[in-house]
Amino acid sequence: MATLHAPAFELPEILNTKTNLADARIGAQVIECSDDFFAEAKRMLQFEAPIFVEDKFDDHGKWMDGWETRRKRHAGYDWCIVKLGVSGKISALDIDTTFFTGNYPASASLEACYAPNGDLTGAKWQSILENTELGPSQHHIFMVNNDAIFTHIRLNIFPDGGVARLRVYGDVHIQVTDHEQTLDLLALENGGRVIAYSDAHFGHPRNLINPGRGVNMGDGWETKRRRAPGYDWCILALGKSGKIEKIEIDTAHFKGNFPAEVSIQAVYLENATDAQLIPQSMFWSYLLEAQPMQMDHIHEYVNEILQYEKVSHIRINMIPDGGISRVRLWGKIAKS
């Protein structure tokens, strides 16, 4: 059976620093749906791009990589409630109908609510996307203008049909309750995000903060071969400022293309704009001086860390180029 892969899609640059709050890898899950007869709603939250497998059928019909409901034979519409992996402010939506050509919804709307205890009884749902027409086999990017914090969303499709992927881009909101807990302050699920980078030819630096170890070489940050003096770099914001106790640099799957060395610079800045950070980052002090790298290996540093009471942003320098899979900054959230 031939397998077709989704066409390459370039996310709008404005969303490159946002987190997909509906990513199953950080805990997003389907709570309830009106119907998922042809394809389970949870597939809609998968990180991987959708595929189409020719001649693949199951007991319900054609297998589709997404959420698909049966044909509606009465008035009404279908819906799906999703608990976001982390609460946050929503900036944009991507309703992706890739490979749904004769079975995509005519239109869709989306509501959101804040229910931190998970009880949706009496929840106040806000409309963040009015009923909007959809097209076949394509991404639909919708910007959202709402400053509220949300924990759940409800996707409504009219009248029925299928959605390959639903992505909800925004900024993670973390309510600090424990300043003594050690956690990865850079992790995607804790609000870490990419601000800028020198190059991302083979893999985007947003992969550095993904959950778990990299699944392959494509699930990491990899730059093109450098043919001029210098080195590659990326700037990231921690989800919360804190004191760093342990650093992990993982070169999983990078064997003939790992960097010779990696160093990390750091700074603590309150209310800094992303634009002002980029030119100043080259002058930040070192949190970790240049360390030699090995192929396909987790490098751990504790005693090598240069002391900072608070860190809010880091700059990772990959000398001179190459690829790394993950970076973890273990520490405690700083007290105000």
From Swiss-Prot:
UniProt similarity note: Belongs to the allantoicase family.
GO process annotations (BP): allantoin catabolic process; purine nucleobase metabolic process
Q: Which InterPro entries match?
A: Allantoicase, Allantoicase_dom, Galactose-bd-like_sf
Q: Which UniProt keywords apply?
A: Hydrolase, Purine metabolism
Q: Which organism is it from?
A: Acinetobacter baumannii (strain ATCC 17978 / DSM 105126 / CIP 53.77 / LMG 1025 / NCDC KC755 / 5377)
> Under which name does UniProt file this protein?
Probable allantoicase
Enzyme class (EC, first level): hydrolase
Please list the disulfide bridges. Answer: none
GO terms of molecular function: allantoicase activity
Q: Which gene encodes it?
A: alc
Q: Which reaction does it catalyse?
A: allantoate + H2O = (S)-ureidoglycolate + urea
* Source domain of life: Bacteria
Q: What does the record give as EC number? A: 3.5.3.4
**Matches recorded under HAMAP family:** Allantoicase
Q: Pathway, per UniProt?
A: Nitrogen metabolism; (S)-allantoin degradation; (S)-ureidoglycolate from allantoate (aminidohydrolase route): step 1/1
